Amino acid sequence: MASMTMTATFFPAVAKVPSATGGRRLSVVRASTSDNTPSLEVKEQSSTTMRRDLMFTAAAAAVCSLAKVAMAEEEEPKRGTEAAKKKYAQVCVTMPTAKICRY
């Protein structure tokens, strides 16, 4: 019964409200053939420009991947060592029981 009274409160919000404009509208659009109209043709790029862009993108991706490898070569210190405590000093101060700070 509770669900019946609950749905009854939604009926006024769901009821269809009559539209202010009653009739249907018809729009007619005339095509323009003026010489002043800008052309919608797609201009083709030369293949050399596209190749240059492709090679530049490939070179940029290669540089980014090499930079990631160079940054990843730095080894993590073993947990509990002085090097680990020095590198993660802020973590060790705020959470002294963190695994990196102790054995």
Swiss-Prot record:
PANTHER family in the record: PHOTOSYSTEM II 5 KDA PROTEIN, CHLOROPLASTIC (PTHR34940:SF5)
Taxonomy, superkingdom: Eukaryota
Record flagged with keyword Transferase: no
Function, in words: May be a component of the oxygen-evolving complex.
A GO CC term assigned to this protein in UniProt: cytosol
Keywords: Chloroplast, Membrane, Photosynthesis, Photosystem II, Plastid, Thylakoid, Transit peptide
Subcellular location: Plastid, Chloroplast thylakoid membrane
PTM per Swiss-Prot/TrEMBL: The maturation of the PSII-T precursor to its final form occurs through a two step process. First, a stromal intermediate is formed, which, upon translocation into the thylakoid membrane, is processed to the mature protein.
Statement: the UniProt record of this protein carries the keyword Transit peptide: yes
Main localization category: plastid
Residue interval of the organelle targeting sequence: 1-75
Name of the molecule in the record: Photosystem II 5 kDa protein, chloroplastic
Organism in which the protein naturally occurs: Arabidopsis thaliana
Any single biological process term in GO: photosynthesis
